[in-house]
C-alpha cells in the first residue's frame, strides 16, 4: 500500500512539474484539465504524447515570432514527448485564409517544396532533429477520394465556418469567399485525425483551426486533442506583431551583430515577454530577473544585454554572442567603429548620396535611401547628412553609416 501511494505521489508530482513548464508563456489551453489527464496517462503508460504543429510553407524565412511555438515544442521534447511537424504541402496550395481580407494566390508545388526545405533547415535551430518527425500532409490528404472529401465536409456547417472573424467580415462586406477556403480548417483538422494527435500548438490567431481538429477527432471517434494557443510576439516597435513586411523583426538567419543590435533596440517593457517566449532561460532565473527589474537591483540595460546574448547564442554560438556584445559596446557605448565592415571601391570623384548608399548595400533602393537621409539616419565620417540631394566627394577611407548598425568604408579607385 505504501509503495502504491508513493508511486502515485511521484506521478502526480511529475504531472505538476510538466504542467508548470508547459504553461510558461501560453495564452490559452483548451481544456487544461485534458492536458493534465493526458500527461498523467502518458507517464503511467510510458507512451509519449503526440504533439503536432502544422507549418504552411508560404513564407520560408523564419523570424523570432515564428519560434514562439517552436520553443514550446522543444519543451515537450525535453519532457520526453514526440513532436510531429506537418509541412502543409497540400494545404499550402490553398494558403491559410486566417486574417486575410481576400482570397489568396495558390502556390505551385515547386514553390511549396522549395519553401518546405528552407523551413526544415531553420526549425532545427530550435528543435532536436533526432526527436522530431517531419511529414507532409499530402501523404493522407492527397489520397482522399471525392466521396471521403464529401464525408469530411459533412462533419461541419457553413454557419460554423462563418463564426470565424475573417470569414464573417468578408461575408458582411460582400467580399468573395471561395469554397476551397472553407476546406483549409477542415484539412488542418483532418491532419489531427490522420495522426491521432494528443496536442496541437498554434498562435492565438489559429484557435478556430485548432478547435476544428478537436471537433473532427470527436466526429471520427478519437479522443480530442488539447489545443494550446501561444501569444503573437510583438515586434521591435512594441506596437504591431513581429512581421518581416513591417521591418520590426529579428530573423533567425541574421548575423550575430545584427541580431544583438536589434534586440538592444527593443522597448524595455517587452524584455520579459521576449525572455519568456523566445529564450530557454529557466523559470527560476526568469523570476529573479523579473524581481530584479521591479526592485531596481537589476538595470534594464544589463537585463537586455543578457537577453541579446541568449538570443544570439541560441541561433549561433555563445562565443558569437560575446563577440557581438563586444562590438556593440565598442560601437554604441564607446562610439568606435566596428572592426569588420563592408568595403567599397568607388571610381567616380563625386557620387549622389542615395545611389552611393545603394551601391554600398546600406539601402535597398534610392527611394529608401532618401527616406533614411531625411530622417537623419545617415552619417558620413560621423557627420549627419539630411539633404537627399547631397553629392558626396569621395575620399579614401571615408565611412558611410546608415542607422545604428550599418557601415561601409569607401576607397578611391
From Swiss-Prot:
Reaction it catalyzes? tRNA(Tyr) + L-tyrosine + ATP = L-tyrosyl-tRNA(Tyr) + AMP + diphosphate + H(+)
Record-annotated residues binding ATP? 244
Q: List the SMART domains hit by this protein, alphabetically.
A: S4
Could you list this entry's UniProt keywords, alphabetically sorted: Aminoacyl-tRNA synthetase, ATP-binding, Cytoplasm, Ligase, Nucleotide-binding, Protein biosynthesis, RNA-binding
Q: Which GO terms describe its biological process?
A: tyrosyl-tRNA aminoacylation
Q: Which residues form the S4 RNA-binding domain?
A: 351-412
Query: Entry's Gene3D superfamilies?
Result: HUPs (3.40.50.620), RNA-binding S4 domain (3.10.290.10), Tyrosyl-Transfer RNA Synthetase (1.10.240.10)
Record keywords: Nucleotidyltransferase included?
no
What does the sequence similarity comment in the record state about its family? Belongs to the class-I aminoacyl-tRNA synthetase family. TyrS type 2 subfamily.
Write out the function statement from the record: Catalyzes the attachment of tyrosine to tRNA(Tyr) in a two-step reaction: tyrosine is first activated by ATP to form Tyr-AMP and then transferred to the acceptor end of tRNA(Tyr).
Q: What is this protein called?
A: Tyrosine--tRNA ligase
**From what organism does this protein derive?**
Moorella thermoacetica (strain ATCC 39073 / JCM 9320)
Taxonomy of origin reads: Bacteria, Bacillati, Bacillota, Clostridia, Moorellales
Amino acid at each position: 500500500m505504501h509503495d502504491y501511494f508513493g508511486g502515485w505521489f511521484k506521478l502526480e508530482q511529475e504531472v505538476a512539474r510538466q504542467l508548470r513548464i508547459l504553461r510558461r508563456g501560453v495564452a490559452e489551453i483548451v481544456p487544461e484539465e485534458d492536458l493534465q489527464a493526458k500527461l498523467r496517462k502518458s507517464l503511467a503508460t510510458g507512451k509519449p504524447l503526440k504533439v503536432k504543429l502544422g507549418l504552411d510553407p508560404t513564407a520560408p524565412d523564419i523570424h523570432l515570432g515564428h519560434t514562439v511555438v517552436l520553443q514550446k515544442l522543444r519543451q515537450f521534447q525535453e519532457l520526453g514527448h514526440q513532436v510531429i511537424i506537418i509541412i502543409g504541402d497540400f494545404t499550402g496550395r490553398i494558403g491559410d485564409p486566417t486574417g486575410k481580407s481576400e482570397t489568396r494566390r495558390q502556390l505551385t508545388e515547386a514553390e511549396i517544396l522549395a519553401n518546405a526545405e528552407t523551413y526544415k533547415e531553420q526549425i532545427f535551430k530550435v528543435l532536436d532533429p533526432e526527436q522530431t518527425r517531419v511529414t507532409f500532409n499530402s501523404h493522407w490528404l492527397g489520397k482522399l477520394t471525392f466521396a471521403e472529401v464529401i464525408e469530411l465536409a459533412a462533419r461541419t456547417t457553413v454557419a460554423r465556418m462563418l463564426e470565424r472573424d475573417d470569414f464573417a467580415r468578408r461575408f458582411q462586406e460582400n467580399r468573395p469567399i471561395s469554397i476551397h477556403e472553407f476546406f483549409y480548417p477542415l484539412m488542418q483538422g483532418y491532419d489531427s485525425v490522420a495522426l491521432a494527435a494528443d496536442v496541437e500548438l498554434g498562435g492565438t490567431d489559429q484557435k478556430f483551426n485548432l478547435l476544428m481538429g478537436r471537433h473532427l477527432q470527436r466526429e471520427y471517434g478519437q479522443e480530442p486533442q488539447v489545443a494550446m494557443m501561444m501569444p503573437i510576439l510583438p515586434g521591435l516597435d512594441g506596437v504591431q506583431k513581429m512581421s518581416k513586411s513591417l521591418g520590426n523583426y529579428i530573423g533567425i538567419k541574421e548575423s550575430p551583430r545584427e541580431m544583438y543590435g536589434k534586440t538592444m533596440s527593443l522597448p524595455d517593457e517587452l524584455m520579459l515577454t521576449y525572455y519568456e517566449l523566445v529564450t530557454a532561460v529557466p523559470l527560476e532565473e526568469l523570476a529573479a530577473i523579473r524581481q530584479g527589474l521591479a526592485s531596481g537591483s537589476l538595470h534594464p540595460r544589463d537585463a537586455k544585454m543578457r537577453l541579446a546574448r541568449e538570443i544570439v547564442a541560441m541561433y549561433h554560438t555563445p562565443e558569437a554572442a560575446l563577440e557581438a556584445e563586444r562590438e556593440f559596446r565598442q560601437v554604441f557605448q564607446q562610439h568606435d567603429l566596428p572592426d569588420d565592415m563592408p568595403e567599397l571601391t568607388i571610381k567616380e570623384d563625386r557620387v549622389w548620396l542615395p545611389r552611393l548608399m545603394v551601391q554600398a548595400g546600406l539601402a535597398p533602393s534610392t527611394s529608401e535611401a532618401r527616406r533614411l537621409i531625411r530622417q537623419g539616419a545617415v552619417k558620413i565620417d560621423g557627420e549627419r547628412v539630411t539633404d537627399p540631394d547631397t553629392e558626396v566627394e569621395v575620399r579614401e577611407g571615408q565611412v558611410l553609416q546608415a542607422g545604428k548598425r550599418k557601415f561601409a568604408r569607401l576607397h578611391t579607385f
